[in-house]
Amino acid sequence: FNNLNPAFLPLSVHAAQTAIEKICPEAKNLLLVPENHTRNQFYLTNVARLAAILRHTGLNVRIGSLLPEITAPTTLDLSDGQTLTLEPLKRLGPGGRRLGLEDFDPCAILLNNDLSAGVPDMLKNLHEQFVIPPLQAGWHVRRKSRHFAAYHEVALAFAQEIGIDPWLIDPEFEVCGQINFHERTGEECLTAQVDTLLYRIRAKYRENGIDREPFVIVKADAGTYGMGIMTVKDASEVKDLNRRQRNKMAVGKEGLLVTEVMIQEGVPTVETVAAGTAEPVVYMIDRYVVGGFYRVNTQRGIDENLNAPGMRFEPLAFDTGCTLPDQAQAPDAPPNRFYAYGVVARLALLAASIELERSEIGS
């Protein structure tokens, strides 16, 4: 949340207030559990900004760390002049059924940790407090393909409702399991799926008069951080990976082995900011769009992953906060473009709720 434009702070606070009232109306104390970073200044500033938004709602917010070296309150200096205090987590109450800090027993626990490496023992068996999001939303069980399957359903229904081709808002994708890049197993599946997807994309390009070379993105089905990603324009490319490319694709966040991949239609990044390829990122709290920013990378092209060295963020005052179109202006005028981004973000959030509901049923 460090890239959220300050102009949208009131909207963010209102959205956070709405979310908290639904989850824990009597909440006074909230515990924020971040990722295990102490050196990533951008991430720590994000945690501080998120805590500030929550404090503006009237909550007492403290930050509990899972890091074993945090054994006492530890204050970190941030690059913007602020400080952030991390405190050691501890189990509270009879039988340790609650999670909190020394002299701090929260109503709710907000995870800003994606649980890529699994659920730590400290977070297990919490039956008396709200954990937001629930543990089964972590990347130890979550898969990108399940999210996009749910998004496909939502986008299809929405497109039928307003009379557009769902392909305009729903990129094609396929999945391959049983992959081992080091041992070169699963290459046949990967090659076939890349070939199939490129064929379908070419057909859609012809149908829509798009004069571009189609491409797909091969990415790890689990995990975040822009790891394990490659751009492919021909199926032969995935058969002829050199050792360096295989090593890059084989491991994701927390050093976990990549065994499942998603092959996703590549969408050319046509926007630029200060001569850099730029893609919009939309912030949401609860069901509200609260602003956004551009991820910019001057070292990457329109068909590449921008989450890579050379990346920077441009917090932009998205006109009207992505919530109001302007019918007097052209369809691609900034207020209307940002409104369209906000619509897709809300569809994606609805898809995430469906994905989460299904994971609860399956757990």
Q: Model-predicted segments: where are they?
A:
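Conserved metal-phosphate-binding beta-hairpin within the catalytic cores
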Residues: F1-N2, K219, G266, A278-R287, ...
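Short, flexible loop/turn elements at secondary-structure junctions
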Residues: P34-N36, K90-L92, L110-L115, L135-Q136, ...
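Conserved catalytic alpha/beta cores of large enzymes that bind or transform nucleotide phosphates
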Residues: I20-N36, Y43, P309-S363
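Conserved N-proximal alpha/beta basic substrate-recognition cap immediately N-terminal to
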Residues: L9-L11, A15-T18, T38-R55, R62-R212
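Short acidic, Gly/Ser-rich segments with clustered Asp/Glu that frequently serve as metal-coordination loops
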Residues: F1-N2, T38, G223
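Short N-terminal or domain-adjacent regulatory/targeting segments
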Residues: N3-A27
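Phosphate-binding site of ATP-dependent enzymes
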Residues: Q193-F215, A222-L316
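Conserved hydrophobic helix-helix packing surfaces used for dimerization/oligomerization
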Residues: N29-L32, I109, V216
